[in-house]
């Protein structure tokens, strides 16, 4: 019996020793990963995302310039048609050209208004949201990267707890990861990390003991990623709740499990409450104004499907009380010989072929309008032709006044001749009463009434005075009757 007891006691001691050894060595081999650093599989996608986000402000600047460039192209087209009309006031394509000029003017004004009130705001919103999210990511990654020293403190690791990520200028290990905001330059960019659906390359999950994003516990630790009161950053007392970092992407637990990464791959309305910064950057990205938007480009398709052109026809060419069905389409078809989209090409080609000679607006060589694209130069050319047109109006007005003066002078002389032809025949003179004739009993001859003669002479002098002063503010009705083509020119 004694021998048996001794053996049992010895066996018990051996088991106790073995158990102690297992307990002592267990943390180094199988303890949960709640206090180790963040694996590269988790932080590298964040680096890719923050690198992409750093380019959004430059991308928005580039998109804004593209929008303005598109509007300028439409403005250039408006200038060209206006120049053609100013240069060719008697063109047979007056209505078609005027309609096209009005279309381009509406598109230009509408595009500027749309960009001023809506488009620009969407681009600024996207740049702002991207910068805010990038700041949240950069701040925490920078903190994790900085928390290292010796063999124990490592918060950004590669694949195991003891190998910290190494910074080489703008890279962490082999991954571009500049935690700063670069200079804003207008550049196009490709979106791969923040797409129309969300953040497809970000990891998600964790929250257990499977070492998904934090490696097995070893010498290297990162207590910042654990809210456990024994193994994490709290002292003695447990935390009331879990901690949210990275703008809601990561949850640091207050139990002995690893951190949890939220699913940001497919964004939706639910993220607006749980991760507002991520939701805002995603939503803003999908609402950015782009140069290809209809507000900033020419309309396409059949003429009767182009809203701007139809609205212009209704305003300019149809009676206000028109109730005819498809009246706009009927008018467009009559003007352009059909409704196909290319029916305006004939008139636009005619405008582009118009030659602007050397000497106009400082040009040293002649060129067709189709080869001139700068809006400043086109504006100068239009101003030049408008000045020529204004001078032509002054010259024509003077010529018309001279003709009127001559006609009035001849009228007075002719009337006086008619009266004088009656000579001393009083009865014949009385028959010319309606012509302004009166019989002078003293001189015994038929004469033009004194007041009629004075009136005609006065009108003649007034006309002569206006001609000398080059007065260009005379009756428009006079010009309308005398120069209908000039009036048409002035209207355009």
Swiss-Prot record:
SUPFAM superfamilies: Variant surface glycoprotein (N-terminal domain), Variant surface glycoprotein MITAT 1.2, VSG 221, C-terminal domain. It is a lipid-anchor; GPI-anchor. InterPro entries: Trypano_VSG_A_N_dom (IPR001812), VSG_C_dom_sf (IPR027446). Residues 476-492 form a propeptide. It comes from the Eukaryota. It is found in: Cell membrane. Keywords: Cell membrane, Disulfide bond, Glycoprotein, GPI-anchor, Lipoprotein, Membrane, Signal, Trypanosomiasis. Its main location: membrane. One of its GO terms (cellular component) is plasma membrane. The keyword Glycoprotein applies. A lipid is attached at residue 475 (GPI-anchor amidated serine). Glycans are attached at residues 298, 471. Disulfide bonds join 47-177, 155-222. Residues 1-32 form the signal peptide. One of its GO terms (biological process) is symbiont-mediated evasion of host immune response. VSG forms a coat on the surface of the parasite. The trypanosome evades the immune response of the host by expressing a series of antigenically distinct VSGs from an estimated 1000 VSG genes. This is Variant surface glycoprotein MITAT 1.1.
């Amino acid at each position: 019996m004694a021998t048996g007891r001794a053996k049992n006691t010895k066996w018990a001691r051996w088991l106790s020793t073995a158990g102690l050894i297992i307990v002592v060595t267990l943390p180094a081999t199988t303890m949960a990963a709640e206090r180790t650093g963040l694996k590269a599989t988790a932080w590298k996608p964040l680096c890719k995302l923050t690198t992409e986000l750093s380019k959004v402000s430059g991308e928005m600047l580039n998109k804004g310039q593209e929008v303005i460039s598109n509007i300028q192209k439409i403005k250039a087209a408006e200038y060209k048609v206006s120049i053609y009309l100013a240069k060719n006031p008697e063109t047979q394509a007056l209505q078609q050209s005027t309609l096209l000029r009005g279309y381009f003017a509406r598109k230009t004004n509408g595009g500027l208004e749309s960009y001023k009130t809506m488009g620009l705001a969407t681009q600024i919103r996207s740049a702002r949201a991207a910068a805010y999210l990038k700041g949240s990511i950069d701040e925490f990654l920078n903190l994790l990267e900085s928390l290292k020293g010796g063999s124990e403190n490592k918060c950004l690791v590669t694949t195991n707890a003891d190998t910290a990520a190494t910074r080489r200028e703008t890279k962490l290990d082999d991954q571009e990861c500049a935690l700063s905001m670069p200079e804003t330059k207008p550049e196009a960019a490709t979106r791969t990390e923040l797409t129309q659906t969300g953040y497809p390359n970000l990891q998600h999950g964790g929250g257990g003991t499977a070492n998904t994003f934090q490696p097995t516990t070893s010498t290297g630790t990162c207590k910042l990623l654990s809210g456990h009161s024994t193994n994490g950053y709290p002292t003695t007392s447990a935390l009331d709740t879990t901690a949210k970092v990275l703008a809601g992407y990561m949850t640091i637990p207050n139990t002995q499990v690893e951190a949890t990464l939220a699913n940001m791959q497919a964004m939706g309305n639910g993220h607006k409450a749980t991760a507002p910064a991520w939701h805002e950057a995603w939503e803003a990205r999908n609402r950015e104004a782009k140069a290809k938007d209809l507000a900033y480009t020419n309309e396409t398709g059949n003429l009767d499907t182009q809203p701007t052109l139809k609205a212009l026809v209704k305003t300019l060419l149809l009676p206000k009380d028109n109730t005819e069905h498809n009246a706009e389409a009927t008018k467009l078809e009559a003007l352009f010989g059909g409704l196909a989209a290319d029916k305006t090409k004939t008139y636009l080609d005619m405008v582009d072929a118009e030659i602007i000679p050397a000497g106009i607006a400082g040009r040293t060589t002649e060129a067709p309008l189709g080869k001139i694209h700068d809006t400043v130069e086109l504006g100068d050319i239009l101003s030049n032709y408008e000045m020529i047109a204004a001078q032509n109006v002054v010259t024509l007005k003077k010529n018309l006044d001279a003709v009127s003066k001559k006609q009035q002078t001849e009228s007075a002389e002719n009337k006086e001749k008619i009266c004088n032809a009656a000579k001393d025949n009083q009865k014949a003179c009385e028959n010319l009463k309606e012509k302004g004739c009166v019989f002078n009993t003293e001189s015994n001859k038929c004469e033009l009434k004194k007041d009629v003669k004075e009136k005609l002479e006065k009108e003649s002098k007034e006309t002569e005075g206006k001609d000398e002063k080059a007065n260009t503010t005379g009756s428009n009705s006079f010009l309308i009757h005398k120069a209908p083509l000039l009036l048409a020119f002035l209207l355009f």
